[in-house]
C-alpha cells in the first residue's frame, strides 16, 4: 500500500490526495467518471457527424461525377462580375437565395448562341478565368466544369514545324556575313538576353531577307530553326491569301497568338511579296482582301514588344514591290541582302554539296567556279547533281573533273532554254 502512495507522490498528486478524506476521494472519482462518460458521448457524436459528412461528400462527389459526364457544351466566358447583395438591398418579402450570394459571377455565351448569367461559376476557380476563355459547361445546369485549351485554326497548327530541320550553318557556303547578321538579330536575343539588357539596347523585332532566287534565303532560315530550340512556325505568303473576307487576317492573328503561347518562337514568312505588295486603289474584292491581310500583319508586327521571345523572319526576291510600311524601322528592323555568289562562294558551295560524293582528287573546284559565272547557289548544287548523274550513266565509281564540266554545260543549257522560254 505504501508503494502505491509513493508512486502517486512521484506523479505530483500525492500530497493533494493525502490531505483528502475517503469521502472526498470517492466524490472526486465519481466526478471523473461522469466527465469520462460525457467525453465518450462527445467523441461518439463527433464520430457520427464525421461519418455523416463523409457520406455527404461521397454523395456530392458522385453527383459531380454524373454532372461531369461528357459531352460538355462548349462556351465562351464573356465577362466576370463581382456581386455584393448588400449594395442592392430592397424591401420585400421574397428573397431569392441566388441573389444573396457573394463573390464572382460569370456571363457565358454557348455554342448555341445563347447568353447566360451564372451566379455560381462551377468547379473552376474564378481566379483562373478571364474573358474570352473557352470552357466546357454542363448542358443542363450550365455550370462551368472545365477550362478548354485555346482554339486555333487547324491551318495554323499545321504551320508548326514538328521535325527539326537538319541543316547547319556549315552547310551554307559564301554567306558568312549574312549568317552573322541573322544570328545577331534572332538567335542571340533568345539565347543571351542578358547581353542586350546589360547594354540597354532593344533587339530587332524581325529580319527581312531579300535577293535573287536560289541564293539561300530559305536554307538559312531552316538552319536558324535547327540551331535554336524555339518553336518554328513556317508560313507561306500564298497561304495567307484566302477566298473569304477576313480569313487571311484571322490566320495571321492565330499564327501570332500561337507563337506567343509557345514562346520562344520564330515565325518564318516565305514569299512575303504575295501579301506585302504596295497598296493601290482597286475595285476588285480580291485585291482589297490581300491588302487587309497585309494590314493585319503590320498590326501584329507593331503589337508585340521587342523583348518578347517572338521573332519574325521574312523572305522575298521582289523587295522592290513591297509596301514601304513593311520596310520601315520598327517592324522588320534588319534587312539582309543575299547577292549572287562570287567565285570563292561558288567553289565553297560545290565543295559542300560534293562532301558525301565519291569525288576524284583531281577535281579543281576553283576552275569549276570560274566556269560557273552568273550561277546562283541552287544552280551550283544542280551542277553537282548533274555530274553525279553523268558519272552514274557511264558506270563510274567516282566523279571526275570532266563530269563536273559536263554538268556545268547541262545546267547552262537549261538556263539558256529557260531564258528563251520566258523572253
From Swiss-Prot:
One of its GO terms (biological process) is proteasome-mediated ubiquitin-dependent protein catabolic process. One of its GO terms (molecular function) is ATP hydrolysis activity. Keywords: ATP-binding, Cytoplasm, Nucleotide-binding, Nucleus, Proteasome. It is found in: Cytoplasm; Nucleus. It comes from the Eukaryota. Its main location: cytoplasm. Signal peptide: none annotated. InterPro entries: 26S_Proteasome_ATPase, AAA+_ATPase, AAA_lid_3, ATPase_AAA_core, ATPase_AAA_CS, NA-bd_OB-fold, P-loop_NTPase, Prot_ATP_ID_OB_2nd. ATP binds at residues 211-218. GO terms for cellular component: cytoplasm; nucleus; proteasome accessory complex; proteasome regulatory particle, base subcomplex. May form a heterodimer with a related family member. Belongs to the AAA ATPase family. The 26S proteasome is involved in the ATP-dependent degradation of ubiquitinated proteins. The regulatory (or ATPase) complex confers ATP dependency and substrate specificity to the 26S complex. This is 26S proteasome regulatory subunit 6A-A. It comes from Xenopus laevis.
